[in-house]
């Protein structure tokens, strides 16, 4: 019996997922372009370095390194097969690109775009940068401030009240509490203000959303009004209904800065401070002295929160701050222009990318898998400024409830992306042999079944793949089933080809001239082995 060798687990995934293909085509033959263009036959190539002299069929839009293990190649072909025509995929191992499918095709990236915002913010501002929200004006004399105090917004995206954090159950996030600013004013000796509490949001423009966003983004509260002085995400909580256990609803405010001043006024009154003139909008006087201030958590923690929770408001406000630092103003347009500049500095072809906003909500955004993979690698890899702050499969953020019980759990860290007709995933996987795979996957287009099945398959494939198989390598195979648990099924000594419908079984001709039987993560050219699908796969929602 010959020694075991790695196999494409993708094929068995195709079986259980019920994916069918015309008998004349292979899974890899899905063609890019306008939906409905269909598929085309790809040329047959014979590459001894790739397949040991076997004949492989390759998509002309897909390139593979000759020395890449055919198991991984076939598995990644399976990922493409599970995806709509408008899909890009790139996989690097050890900084060498091993698989590219339409990797230079510009597609809607959804929230994976946030990796660019995080990278630029950390590069331009530094991980230790803190946003500062100040109250300026005349100091108190015998507890009395004669005149106005001005609340100056510093762009803190996580400024909140303790009540809002409690109701929204976000207290575990790196929040900045407005309550602390009220405490600081009391500690500074303020007991009465004879004037007004003025709100200054002049650091950024007052465009409350991205003009090209659909109206439903605001009506569905996907993002609150944007501004340099925003508290509680720009929402006001409805009064709590006595006896109700449900959290109160929230309403979007029209003037976020004025709302912030109103909230501070409530907090001051609760501490015995009176403000004779109420609240108003305005700009702080030039040279006004600081009376009290509150600082955010370090930017590194803010970026982590943005990436883990896919926080749209944080991404948009960071984009405006990037514009301020660039010297071109606190607007979305200036921020996105600076992001493009940073991308060019990193060697990313800027003609392949379009930034209409910072969060990835806009359907006018365009990124390539090449661009995403490049920024992930050039920002320091899995332990770099972005990689170290990504959600981890089965543990944190938008991936906390995904890939549970699979080889990807704890090994995959990535940014998710989801819009109607868009699903994306980009990040890193620590493979079982210790090597790191960097990957980017974007799929655009409606899918009849679970839209995440392609990226789920990708994560599990990379999580359990070994670049070198040994005689004692035999791990349970895990197949993504679009969020449904898999019952344990024993398939005793059955050639893989016998399990497939004829159209899919034709793909096996690319593997060997003799039947192969799957055993864990490897195969042996022998009889008598069994296959156990004993591990369930669970997928979960994530932006």
Where are these regions (language model features)?
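Active-site SXXK
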Residues: 95, 109-127, 197, 229, ...
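Small-residue-rich helix-loop
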Residues: 100, 319, 323-483
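Mid-domain, small-residue-enriched loop/turn segments at the edges of structured enzyme/sensor domains
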Residues: 86-88, 144-227, 234, 273, ...
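Short, gly/Ser/Thr-rich active-site loops of penicillin-recognizing serine hydrolases
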Residues: 457-536
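Beta-lactamase-like hydrolase cores
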Residues: 38-106, 180-189, 193
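Short, well-structured active-site flanking segments
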Residues: 123-138, 146, 276-280, 383-387
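C-terminal region of N-terminal signal peptides and the immediate post-cleavage residues
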Residues: 17-56, 130, 272
């Amino acid at each position: 019996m010959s020694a075991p060798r790695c196999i494409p687990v993708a094929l068995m995934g195709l079986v259980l997922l019920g994916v069918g293909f015309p008998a004349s085509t292979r899974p890899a033959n899905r063609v890019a372009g306008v939906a409905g263009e269909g598929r085309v036959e790809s040329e047959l190539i014979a590459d001894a370095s790739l397949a040991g002299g076997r004949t492989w069929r390759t998509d002309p839009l897909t390139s593979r390194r000759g020395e890449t293990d055919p198991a991984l190649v076939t598995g990644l072909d399976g990922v493409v097969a599970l995806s709509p025509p408008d899909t890009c995929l790139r996989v690097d191992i050890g900084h060498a690109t091993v698989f590219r499918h339409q990797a230079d095709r510009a597609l809607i990236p959804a929230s994976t775009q946030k990796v660019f915002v995080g990278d630029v913010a950390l590069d331009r501002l530094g991980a230790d940068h803190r946003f500062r929200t100040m109250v300026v004006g005349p100091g108190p004399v015998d507890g009395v401030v004669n005149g106005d105090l001005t609340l100056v917004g510093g762009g803190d995206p996580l400024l909140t009240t303790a009540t809002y954090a409690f109701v929204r159950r976000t207290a575990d996030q790196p929040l900045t509490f407005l309550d602390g600013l009220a405490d600081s004013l009391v500690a500074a000796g303020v007991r009465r203000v004879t004037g007004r509490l003025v709100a200054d949001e002049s650091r950024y423009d007052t465009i409350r959303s991205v003009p090209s966003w659909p109206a439903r983004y605001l009506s569905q509260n996907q993002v609150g009004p944007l501004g340099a002085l925003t508290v509680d995400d720009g929402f006001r909580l409805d009064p709590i209904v006595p006896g109700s256990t449900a959290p109160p609803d929230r309403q979007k405010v029209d003037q976020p800065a004025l709302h912030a001043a109103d909230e501070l006024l409530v907090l001051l009154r609760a501490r015995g401070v009176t403000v004779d003139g109420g609240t108003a909008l305005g700009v702080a006087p030039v040279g006004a002295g600081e009376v009290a201030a509150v600082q955010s958590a370090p930017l590194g923690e803010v970026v982590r929160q943005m990436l883990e929770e896919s926080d749209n408001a944080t991404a948009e406000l960071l984009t405006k701050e990037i514009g301020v630092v660039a010297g071109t103003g606190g607007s979305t347009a200036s921020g996105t222009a600076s992001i493009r500049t940073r991308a060019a500095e990193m060697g990313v072809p800027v003609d392949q990318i379009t930034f209409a906003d910072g969060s990835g909500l806009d359907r006018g955004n365009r990124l390539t898998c090449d661009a995403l993979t490049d920024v992930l690698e050039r920002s320091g890899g899995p332990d770099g400024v972005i990689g170290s702050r990504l959600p981890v499969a089965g543990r944190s953020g938008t991936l906390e409830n995904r890939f549970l019980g699979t080889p990807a759990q704890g090994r995959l860290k990535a940014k998710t992306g989801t819009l109607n007709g868009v699903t994306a995933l980009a990040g890193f996987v620590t493979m079982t042999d210790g090597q790191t795979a960097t990957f980017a996957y974007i799929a655009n287009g409606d899918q009849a079944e679970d839209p995440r099945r392609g990226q789920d398959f990708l994560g599990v494939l990379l999580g359990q793949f070994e670049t070198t198989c040994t005689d004692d390598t035999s791990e349970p195979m895990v197949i993504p089933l679009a969020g449904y648990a898999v019952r344990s099924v024993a398939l005793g000594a059955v050639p893989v080809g016998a399990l497939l419908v004829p159209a899919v079984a034709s793909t096996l001709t690319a593997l060997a001239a003799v039947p192969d039987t799957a055993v864990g993560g490897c195969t042996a050219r022998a009889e008598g082995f069994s296959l156990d699908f004993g591990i369930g796969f669970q997928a979960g929602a994530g932006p």
